[in-house]
Amino acid sequence: MSGPASSTGFHIHAEGLHERNVQPSKPTSDGGVAPKALDDKSRVEEDERTDSEKKTFGRTPGGTIFTVPPTRDMVSQLLSPSEPKNLSDIFVLAIISCHIFLLRFLPSSFRVAAFAIIFLFWRAAYNIGIGWLLHMQSNGRTLVCWAKKSNIFVNPSTGRNPHPVLYNLLKWELETKIPEQYSFEDAPTEYNTWLVFRRVVDLILMCDFTSYCLFAIACGGRPAGEGFIMLALRWITGMSLVLFNLWVKLDAHRVVKDFAWYWGDFFYLIDQDLTFDGVFEMAPHPMYSVGYAGYYGISLMAASYKLLFISILAHAAQFAFLVLVENPHIEKTYNAPPPRKRVAVDTDNVKPQDDDVSQDSSVINDNEYSGKAVATLEPSSMHNLLGPHNFDLYRITDSSVLLIQILFSALAILTPSTPVYQFFFVLNAALWRVWYSVGIGYILNRQSHCKMWTRHFVKYGESNQEAWQQWKGTYHLSMTMTYASFIAATWKMYSFPQDWGYGLVLLRHILGASLIALQIWTSASIYESLGEFGWFFGDFFFDQSPKLTYSGIYRYLNNPERVLGLAGVWGAVLITSTKSVISLALLSHTLTIAFIQLVERPHMQKLYGQSLRRDAGLVRSLKRSLPPSLKQFHGSVDKILDDSIEFIEEFIEAARPKLAAGVKTFVKDTSALFQKYPARITISRLEPDLAGYDQKDYSISLEGTQSSEPAQFERASDKEGEKARSMPDRRGEQVNLMFEYGAPIKVKWTAPLNHSKKDWIGLYMVTDNTSREITRISSQGRWIGTNKASFDSLTCEQGLISSDIVINKFREDGEPKDVASGEMVFSGDKLWWTQGVFEFRYHHNGKHNVMAVSRPFEIRIGRFDDDAIYGDRYGLVRAAIESALLPVVQNCFDRDPDIAPQTVEEQYGSLVDRNGKYSRRVVFAVHQMFGIEFAPEVVRADGNVRNLAWRICNAKKVLAPYSMSRTNGATTPTAEHES
């Protein structure tokens, strides 16, 4: 696990807040820049060549190119006397002064509680308030929509700005702050919106920091009986952390400037490459990780557990902000999925590979679907081991792990904590640790040198893939047993404190829990970077080694498990403070380092050679900051360590014991895990005034792709009564509306000419609403506004084709009348991805009053009937499955040309691997069509329709004796056969 990440399935991307890598790449969500815009930019650059000062160019989602003027940082603008001040600066300084006055005049008994509430308020304004604004801006460009709807940046002389006073105030405010290269009238709306957003952020961040410092002053004190040495250590350590925090902030701002500091890429992008060094080579997300070291330094100087707990809460909230707001936007903007290769695959030359572990399955040749050739070309499965979402009781590895964990827990809890039991639990933990490092290390060493593990399975006729699966189970069981035994031993040695306030008891528990959390995060980061292949040492088993990429946590550390990967072990030492646990921790750390040096490192050097880097980002940063004398000392220490390790390797090679490796075969099944999402509850809003609107002027009509004939004729099958086995005779009625699963649906609507511009149409299940006048359930995003720029989000405009086209319509009473009409298309996430009967509802003025309801229509997936296919059963059935499956898969992939295949051989787009909703749609459709339930990972592993069709054929053959449908194959033996 110490190796760098595989290049398959993982890409290096920029870090979080204030540290995203501002590349000149195009954002993936809103399209690129028009050619005309690029020509405009070329002309601008040509005009500016004579300018000695290098300028930065910004690019809005609409393609507008503009010059980004230089700005100053927040602290300089507010506190520097040389910087011009305006009303917003005075307002921020006044709010900060109010906080200071509160500390001065509040009674001492109320200060702590009052400033705790004040700080939590500003922290909530930061993480929840700013987080919500950025989330809405990222997904629907809400802030820019607000600005455009209110016309606050439009010159009042045009007559379109109803707020001339606000316009003049904003113009004076912003031009005072940016005196160079900036014009309020000429700047795009996105940039002006960002500048206003900056002022709000300045207020929140300054008040957040000020209230925290004042809260620390209110909580500060000196513990009773504290000696001078402890006092000095506490203050020296605290000041060091604060100074380190200050350096992190300054260095981060030096690198990313104001653009990333204030989340500029939520509004526009800049065409500029930034060099990330300094703090960005030391730790992932430094503004969120090491950038909060000052909190703990101040808590240490204040000697207050109240302040420490508040600091931990604030730090956790910041990580939540990163995960929920920053990372999704960064992934969407900078880490676009690579374009799909549309080169046709020569299926005639595909060779079977038993040891194929790639996620890109081979395309299967039509002529090779017979006999044993089918088994050799089976696409690899994607039923991973790690993670709660991959836990499967049908798999022997998972069920064994669960049963053993239950047994260990019962033994640890039910047995007394006597010295005898403590000894055996500690001994058991030590033995498992020895096996995990020495035993597993020996197996991997032999596998690296002579393929011992693989040869054993090949000897018995198994494939390399089977050896790989059995190894994964063995390693997973060994790892879980090692940590379970250590936890059990720690539990036995732990004694519950009688007085949490005595000495450093509470602090030890807090630090211990923090170290445990650090190890969990490190393990998750390692797995995220390496995947299953790297986590289980896949390059020991497969010669087709992937290209090295240092991404994720490996961008900063070469071997994160060397220190951070064992932080939880030392956390247990702090919590228990017993010699036995200290011994286990020392043993674990020593064996882990030996495993890395004696097993992993030689194999990595043999496999990757010179492509291995010597120093990680953190080491490079530290070396640059060391004086020359210490650099030479570091080199000498490295030489001594290398010589010592080489001596140990030679000694072990000469005296290595012969270990017998007996491994039993495990049974593995695949089952699906579906995640259920809770329903969202909303309160219906009623429009009080509906006078002047005639509901006869409103109408909705539908157009869609009709479902297949099997789906339409299922209602008239022989399972019905005799009179119901034929299609119903419709007398003067329209045909039944039955649309394909996932196919786009076009909605045509009419409304009065004076209808509200905030009208909208939503998609619902018929059974969800009992009232035809009011909708009392949320559309859950399945709605589109009838007019553009009427709502505060762009997502509600996706699918809108036309609006307010005047047509002459005959009403139900026969009277002709001019009405407004429009069209929209519901597709993708705006559809229901299940079967049922649905309807569209036209709502009035942004509320839930229903003005028109469409005809009910049904979404139905027809059952595939292969009994009607004769001749070459396998070949014809598989071809028929491919033909039936291709349009369904295309619908499941939103008919997006970047991910939806055009032929059965074409590979899926890479976005299918990133977003699990696509594969879940496909497995639902397959289940309804063929009665076969797959896991979503199967769809991603197969990679194209042909492989998926083969898997369905194979599953139908395997499950044929248990099928509930008619079949021409073998059935249960009759009495005649038995006799």
UniProtKB/Swiss-Prot annotation:
Name this polypeptide is given: Phosphatidylethanolamine N-methyltransferase
Location within or outside the cell: Endoplasmic reticulum membrane
Gene: CHO2
Side Lumenal, residues: 1-89, 135-199, 249-281, 326-398, 446-474, 521-565
Cytoplasmic side: 111-113, 221-227, 303-304, 419-422, 495-499, 587-979
One cellular component (GO) term of this entry: endoplasmic reticulum membrane
TM region(s), chain numbering: 90-110, 114-134, 200-220, 228-248, 282-302, 305-325, 399-418, 423-445, 475-494, 500-520, 566-586
Organism: Paracoccidioides lutzii (strain ATCC MYA-826 / Pb01) (Paracoccidioides brasiliensis)
Location of the region described as Disordered in the Swiss-Prot/TrEMBL record: 1-63, 335-362, 704-729
Documented EC number(s): 2.1.1.17
